[in-house]
Amino acid sequence: MSLLLEPYTLRQLTFLNRIAVSPMCQYSSVDGLANDWHLVHLGSRAVGGAGLIFTEATAVTADGRITAQDLGLWNDQQIEPLQRITRFIRAQGAVAGIQLAHAGRKASTWRPWLGKQGSVRVEEGGWVPVGPSPIAFDPRHTVPTQLDERQIQDVIQAFADAAKRALEAGFSVVEVHAAHGYLLHQFLSPLSNQRRDQYGGSFENRIRLVLQVTEAVREVWPQELPLFVRVSATDWVEDGWNPDETVELARRLKALGVDLIDVSSGGTSANAEIPVGPGYQTRFAESIRKASGIATGTVGMITEPAQAEHILRTCQADIIFLARELLRDPYWPLHADDDLGGRKAIWPAQYQRATHRDQPIHESDLRD
């Protein structure tokens, strides 16, 4: 049996397989509300056989959105539109997960397909972003307002409040986004954090906010349900956040009740030279897994079922996160089932005629 296609359990939650839909921003919301696009986008990946379906980075405050069109969970009105999505995901046998995020200094930007770079200025309908220090991401981005300690406490509370709303919305996994150069990663990295208070300077100070956010979320998130944290293992820049620091952070997060580290990289520097290639981030997931004893997920240029299977069999990671490959082919998990000799029973009954299998279909196989 393929490891990729075997069920996988964390706490009291079992996933259909070890394939996760990585959070991918759709930039298609109004006022942070999920709509038909999000239902079809996420629902089709659930029909396609992935065991865990993550929403895009969902902002915990309005000013924490990457773009004005991002999903949000900073008010109660945003709960109900997400409920119909989680209901549909569960009906397909998948688990619904949500990534909670704050963009920090990388907030108030343009939707990527518009071809514009940098910040949306206030006079263009944007807002002034916030960050650990008044350091812009690059010359095209607005210099952020430095958060004071009271505002930092507000951010911590916003993550906890969003987690409570996520539970009401029907999600079973929460992931804290501390990667890709967004707010929590900005506090981790000396490239973006030059504070001189308890949140800056030393390693202990720079990890403080991530630990406090994680602790606040774990406190309100049910003990029987898993909590993930996404990290960038390295900034890919000299004197930036590095893999050794990530390993130590992972140990601290495990002690706080985190169940899996979702391992990515980069995002704090526009000048980073990233050696992108097949599975280029997997070695970080492996080193974190071995050194900290926590489960890891890996993402980035994983395109073939055999490649994913090899990663799992060689104990480099525990879950495979797929992103662009699932945009190209929402049914990648079902095709992987064919390629790797899986259970042969996860195609929806409504789609069985496409599988060239002459077998009876029971009413219980029909998807709602």
Per-segment meaning from a language model:
Residues 1-368:
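Flavin-dependent oxidoreductase catalytic cores
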